[in-house]
């Protein structure tokens, strides 16, 4: 556990959501929402995640038990710094997966924001990956919806040249403290049209997420998950150190966070 804490201090994150005056936890577990921060403001949100799944895929979760810590920060109204490090077991090895992104967002009208940025990840397979993300989100007083397209460039010749990942999240506030959402994640979407896709085919995850964040409190609890489906199958498979399960799976994830 102490090793986890030490290594997690350098971690880099994937997710973030901010309110108008301070960094706030996202009601989503798998999706990124562009922030709506105030000019010249800076704030951060730290969190701890615990997840369990079988036949999972990154970035949804590590296989079996995964722990993670992270920080999500905003600087002004446009800049987002995301940091997360996860710890999971691959075979008999305990491995660390740091991820990080820098995103820049802009307003389009009164309720829509778009974002784009770049980042880096080291997967549990010990493959270095360069990231690019494009996102759009719409937030109102009672609801929010956002979508992301991620391009991942593995720095390994044993993988696809570029992996396509999408995330979609839609939430509705129930009272002042609870947000109920539906999230979906798709990985290796090139498997739908590329017969030579090398990472086992496209995989999809979809399910509910519930977030509890009392207005007067600085903490939030989020729980969610869903089934993982093999949408396509590829006759090609790389020899990279990466799990390519042949069956469907599932993932459950929880997060506890604090604003400061």
Predicted regions and their residues:
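Pocket-lining segment of extracytoplasmic ligand-binding domains
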Residues: 167, 171
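Bacterial N-terminal signal peptides
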Residues: 9-19
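Detector for intrinsically disordered, low-structure N-terminal pre-sequences
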Residues: 4, 14, 27-31
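Transmembrane beta-barrel domains of Gram-negative outer membranes and organellar outer membranes
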Residues: 23-124, 130-132, 137-147, 152, ...
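Active-site glycine- and acidic-residue-rich loops that bind
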Residues: 127, 156-165, 199-201
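Bacterial N-terminal signal peptides that target proteins for export
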Residues: 1-11
